[in-house]
Each structure stands twice: as C-alpha cells, then as structure tokens.
Amino acid sequence: MKTRALNHSTYQHQYHIVWGTKYRRKFLKEYVKPELLAIFGRVMKKYPELQLVSINTDNDHIHIQIEIPPDISVAAAVQQLKSMSSAHLKKKFKFIKTMYLDGGIWSVGYFSSTIGLNEDQIKKYIAWQGQKDMPQVSTLGF
C-alpha cells in the first residue's frame, strides 16, 4: 500500500467496498464488465484523487478496492461511482434500462471496510469473485 500526501496530511486510506444490484438482479454479465471498467476509469479521470486498485464483479454485486483521501468521504466516493455507472450502463444497454425504468440500477446501501495489513488477501478475494470454484475463505488467509 502506497503512502499518499495532501498539502497538510499524509495517509494510507484503502477501502474494500461492495454493493449489489437493485433487487439483486443478475445483469453484471461478462460483456457488461468492460463498460463498467470504462466508466470507472472516467470517474477516476474526473476525480484523480480517487485511486481504483482492483475491481471485480459477480452477477449481482461488485467489489472494489479503492484509495480515498481523507478530505473525501467514503459515501461521496461511492455515490459518484454508483450514479455515474448507473447512468452510463442504462444508456449503453437497453435491457438494463428496461429492467430499471424507475431509477438507479444499484441497491441503496453498500458495505465498506478499511484495508490494512491484509491487503493481499483482499486482492485475492476480489480476484476470485465470480469464479465457480472459489477456494474456501480460510485458504486465502482470512
């Protein structure tokens, strides 16, 4: 994990964040994933202080590992990621737009935890998302 600096602070703030699709609908297919990565890339360009470390999905939820500076709340970062990706995916994929005529595509809430010394285990866990033969959690060192 890299130490970063602002004008008056130095920090290492990495988070593991998970959120699901609204109604747990399984639309995060392999062909949707490149578009999701592209829009998150645009979010990172718009907000260069956010650093996306890793990302992976299962059919109905998304895991990201991200660095967020202390002057930006986790809620604000998640709100940007969710709102921009929701609008883009609805525009790009008609089936998603018809699935969610009433608004956003993501569930209202999210899970977040800080990452410290277990960064490598979190990376492995995220990398294994969506795999059919995911090893037991204990084999990853949790």
Region annotations inferred by a language model:
Residues 1-142:
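Basic nucleic-acid-binding interfaces
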